[in-house]
Amino acid sequence: MNTGFFFFVIMATGLVLTFDTIHAEDKLKCTKTDDCAKYCSQFTDVHPACLGGYCECLRWEGGISS
């Protein structure tokens, strides 16, 4: 295969990992969903969740929610 393709894959992977690291710096770390309730209270119509060790505020766009 062309070496340019492998270079592109390596560079794209590096960019994704860098973006993930930068994006995670402003997130609140958590161990359970209860840790995220205060963090998500700044938004409306969201449900707090602890995903991957960080708080996520999930918005239901339809479907089944509990």
UniProtKB/Swiss-Prot annotation:
Q: List the disulfide bonds.
A: 30-50, 36-55, 40-57
Molecular function per GO: potassium channel regulator activity; toxin activity
The keyword Nucleotide-binding belongs to this UniProt entry's keyword annotation: no
Q: Does the keyword Secreted apply?
A: yes
Compartments, as annotated in UniProt: Secreted
Signal sequence interval, chain numbering: 1-24
The similarity annotation says: Belongs to the short scorpion toxin superfamily. Potassium channel inhibitor family. Alpha-KTx 30 subfamily.
- Domain comment text? Has the structural arrangement of an alpha-helix connected to antiparallel beta-sheets by disulfide bonds (CS-alpha/beta).
Q: What is noted besides the main data?
A: Negative results: does not block Kv7.1/KCNQ1 channels.
Protein name, UniProt field: Potassium channel toxin alpha-KTx 30.1
Source species of the chain: Scorpiops margerisonae (Scorpion)
Q: What is the lineage of its organism?
A: Eukaryota, Metazoa, Ecdysozoa, Arthropoda, Chelicerata
